[in-house]
Amino acid sequence: MKSVFVRRFLIAAAILFIWFIIHTTVVIIDGLNDELKPVDAAVVLGNKVETNGQPADRLKARLDRSVELYKENYYRFIIVSGGIGKEGFDEAEVMKAYLVDKGIPEDNIIEDNNGYNSYMTAQNTSKIMKDLNLNSVMIITQYFHISRTKLAFSKMDIKDVYSAHAKIFDFRDIYSIIREFPAYYKYLLK
Protein backbone atom coordinates (compact mmCIF):
# COMPACT_ATOMS: atom_id res chain seq x y z
CA MET A 1 0.00 0.00 0.00
CA LYS A 2 2.77 2.38 0.96
CA SER A 3 4.78 1.65 -2.21
CA VAL A 4 1.71 2.36 -4.40
CA PHE A 5 1.30 5.75 -2.76
CA VAL A 6 5.00 6.53 -3.12
CA ARG A 7 4.99 5.47 -6.77
CA ARG A 8 1.91 7.61 -7.54
CA PHE A 9 3.47 10.54 -5.74
CA LEU A 10 6.71 10.18 -7.72
CA ILE A 11 4.80 9.93 -11.01
CA ALA A 12 2.77 13.05 -10.14
CA ALA A 13 5.95 14.89 -9.13
CA ALA A 14 7.67 13.88 -12.38
CA ILE A 15 4.68 15.05 -14.44
CA LEU A 16 4.61 18.37 -12.58
CA PHE A 17 8.36 18.81 -13.10
CA ILE A 18 8.11 18.10 -16.84
CA TRP A 19 5.14 20.49 -17.08
CA PHE A 20 7.19 23.15 -15.26
CA ILE A 21 10.17 22.68 -17.62
CA ILE A 22 8.01 22.88 -20.75
CA HIS A 23 6.03 25.87 -19.46
CA THR A 24 9.17 27.72 -18.39
CA THR A 25 10.85 27.07 -21.75
CA VAL A 26 7.82 28.47 -23.58
CA VAL A 27 7.73 31.53 -21.29
CA ILE A 28 11.43 32.27 -21.85
CA ILE A 29 11.19 31.84 -25.62
CA ASP A 30 8.06 34.02 -25.76
CA GLY A 31 9.68 36.70 -23.63
CA LEU A 32 12.92 36.84 -25.58
CA ASN A 33 11.21 37.01 -28.98
CA ASP A 34 10.15 40.62 -29.21
CA GLU A 35 7.04 41.40 -31.24
CA LEU A 36 7.96 44.79 -32.64
CA LYS A 37 5.08 46.36 -34.53
CA PRO A 38 3.85 49.94 -34.69
CA VAL A 39 1.22 50.37 -31.97
CA ASP A 40 -0.71 53.20 -30.34
CA ALA A 41 1.08 53.02 -26.98
CA ALA A 42 3.71 51.23 -24.97
CA VAL A 43 2.96 50.05 -21.45
CA VAL A 44 5.98 50.01 -19.14
CA LEU A 45 5.32 48.00 -16.01
CA GLY A 46 6.68 49.39 -12.77
CA ASN A 47 9.39 47.95 -10.58
CA LYS A 48 11.50 49.00 -7.63
CA VAL A 49 12.46 52.61 -7.01
CA GLU A 50 15.64 53.03 -4.94
CA THR A 51 15.60 54.91 -1.62
CA ASN A 52 17.19 57.89 -3.40
CA GLY A 53 14.11 58.17 -5.64
CA GLN A 54 15.79 56.82 -8.77
CA PRO A 55 14.58 53.79 -10.74
CA ALA A 56 16.36 50.55 -9.85
CA ASP A 57 18.35 48.86 -12.62
CA ARG A 58 15.47 46.63 -13.76
CA LEU A 59 13.12 49.58 -14.01
CA LYS A 60 15.76 51.67 -15.80
CA ALA A 61 16.19 48.86 -18.34
CA ARG A 62 12.44 48.83 -19.01
CA LEU A 63 12.34 52.60 -19.37
CA ASP A 64 15.44 52.70 -21.57
CA ARG A 65 13.88 50.09 -23.85
CA SER A 66 10.73 52.22 -24.10
CA VAL A 67 12.82 55.28 -25.03
CA GLU A 68 14.72 53.28 -27.66
CA LEU A 69 11.52 52.06 -29.33
CA TYR A 70 9.81 55.45 -28.99
CA LYS A 71 12.69 57.04 -30.88
CA GLU A 72 12.26 54.35 -33.57
CA ASN A 73 8.62 55.52 -33.93
CA TYR A 74 6.94 52.33 -32.72
CA TYR A 75 4.37 54.31 -30.70
CA ARG A 76 3.26 57.79 -29.77
CA PHE A 77 2.29 57.30 -26.13
CA ILE A 78 4.02 55.62 -23.22
CA ILE A 79 1.84 54.45 -20.34
CA VAL A 80 3.89 54.13 -17.15
CA SER A 81 2.20 51.89 -14.62
CA GLY A 82 3.09 51.35 -11.00
CA GLY A 83 2.04 51.93 -7.43
CA ILE A 84 3.64 53.29 -4.31
CA GLY A 85 6.41 50.90 -3.31
CA LYS A 86 7.71 50.17 0.17
CA GLU A 87 10.34 52.87 -0.40
CA GLY A 88 7.47 55.41 -0.41
CA PHE A 89 7.80 56.59 -4.02
CA ASP A 90 5.10 56.60 -6.67
CA GLU A 91 6.64 54.39 -9.36
CA ALA A 92 4.63 55.99 -12.18
CA GLU A 93 5.77 59.50 -11.20
CA VAL A 94 9.41 58.40 -10.99
CA MET A 95 9.09 56.64 -14.35
CA LYS A 96 7.57 59.70 -15.98
CA ALA A 97 10.32 61.97 -14.63
CA TYR A 98 12.97 59.56 -15.94
CA LEU A 99 11.38 59.50 -19.40
CA VAL A 100 11.10 63.30 -19.52
CA ASP A 101 14.81 63.51 -18.62
CA LYS A 102 15.48 61.17 -21.57
CA GLY A 103 13.68 63.53 -23.96
CA ILE A 104 10.19 62.03 -24.14
CA PRO A 105 7.57 64.83 -24.33
CA GLU A 106 5.55 65.01 -21.12
CA ASP A 107 2.28 65.10 -23.11
CA ASN A 108 3.10 61.68 -24.57
CA ILE A 109 3.47 60.01 -21.17
CA ILE A 110 0.37 58.71 -19.42
CA GLU A 111 0.59 57.84 -15.73
CA ASP A 112 -1.21 54.88 -14.17
CA ASN A 113 -0.58 55.32 -10.46
CA ASN A 114 -2.64 52.26 -9.50
CA GLY A 115 -0.70 49.54 -11.29
CA TYR A 116 0.17 47.62 -8.14
CA ASN A 117 0.45 44.35 -10.08
CA SER A 118 0.32 43.18 -13.68
CA TYR A 119 -3.39 42.40 -13.52
CA MET A 120 -4.25 45.88 -12.24
CA THR A 121 -2.00 47.38 -14.92
CA ALA A 122 -4.01 45.48 -17.54
CA GLN A 123 -7.31 46.70 -16.03
CA ASN A 124 -6.13 50.29 -15.88
CA THR A 125 -4.63 50.16 -19.38
CA SER A 126 -7.92 48.87 -20.76
CA LYS A 127 -9.71 51.91 -19.32
CA ILE A 128 -7.03 54.32 -20.59
CA MET A 129 -7.23 52.76 -24.05
CA LYS A 130 -11.01 53.18 -24.16
CA ASP A 131 -10.81 56.78 -22.92
CA LEU A 132 -8.18 57.72 -25.52
CA ASN A 133 -9.50 55.49 -28.32
CA LEU A 134 -6.29 53.45 -28.48
CA ASN A 135 -6.40 50.02 -30.11
CA SER A 136 -2.96 48.45 -29.70
CA VAL A 137 -0.19 48.29 -27.12
CA MET A 138 3.34 47.02 -26.66
CA ILE A 139 4.16 45.62 -23.23
CA ILE A 140 7.66 46.40 -21.98
CA THR A 141 8.91 44.40 -19.02
CA GLN A 142 11.40 41.63 -18.18
CA TYR A 143 11.38 38.65 -20.57
CA PHE A 144 10.09 36.18 -17.96
CA HIS A 145 7.15 38.47 -17.16
CA ILE A 146 5.82 38.95 -20.70
CA SER A 147 3.66 35.81 -21.08
CA ARG A 148 1.76 36.42 -17.85
CA THR A 149 1.32 40.10 -18.66
CA LYS A 150 -0.03 39.26 -22.12
CA LEU A 151 -2.44 36.84 -20.44
CA ALA A 152 -3.66 39.61 -18.10
CA PHE A 153 -4.15 41.96 -21.04
CA SER A 154 -6.11 39.33 -22.99
CA LYS A 155 -8.36 38.85 -19.94
CA MET A 156 -9.18 42.58 -20.22
CA ASP A 157 -10.18 41.98 -23.85
CA ILE A 158 -7.23 43.91 -25.25
CA LYS A 159 -6.66 42.18 -28.58
CA ASP A 160 -3.63 43.83 -30.20
CA VAL A 161 -0.87 43.22 -27.67
CA TYR A 162 2.79 43.05 -28.65
CA SER A 163 5.90 42.93 -26.50
CA ALA A 164 9.52 43.92 -26.05
CA HIS A 165 11.76 42.78 -23.23
CA ALA A 166 14.05 44.96 -21.16
CA LYS A 167 17.68 44.26 -21.96
CA ILE A 168 18.88 43.21 -18.53
CA PHE A 169 19.70 39.82 -17.08
CA ASP A 170 20.76 39.04 -13.53
CA PHE A 171 21.03 36.20 -11.05
CA ARG A 172 17.64 37.07 -9.53
CA ASP A 173 15.99 36.03 -12.81
CA ILE A 174 16.22 32.40 -11.66
CA TYR A 175 13.88 33.11 -8.75
CA SER A 176 11.62 35.22 -10.97
CA ILE A 177 11.35 32.50 -13.62
CA ILE A 178 10.37 29.92 -10.99
CA ARG A 179 7.83 32.35 -9.51
CA GLU A 180 6.20 32.88 -12.91
CA PHE A 181 4.99 29.27 -13.07
CA PRO A 182 2.37 29.48 -10.28
CA ALA A 183 1.71 33.18 -10.99
CA TYR A 184 0.75 32.42 -14.61
CA TYR A 185 -1.83 29.84 -13.55
CA LYS A 186 -3.17 32.12 -10.84
CA TYR A 187 -3.88 34.71 -13.57
CA LEU A 188 -5.26 32.05 -15.89
CA LEU A 189 -7.84 31.08 -13.27
CA LYS A 190 -8.85 34.68 -12.42
Residues covered by each model-derived region:
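Short, Lys/Arg-enriched, disordered terminal segments
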Residues: M1-L10, Y74, D101, L189-K190
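A structural signal for short, hydrophobic/glycine-enriched beta-strand patches
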Residues: T24-I177
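A transmembrane-helix-recognition feature enriched in membrane-embedded lipid enzymes
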Residues: D173-L189
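Enrichment for repetitive, rod-forming helical segments
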Residues: A14-I15, L69, K186
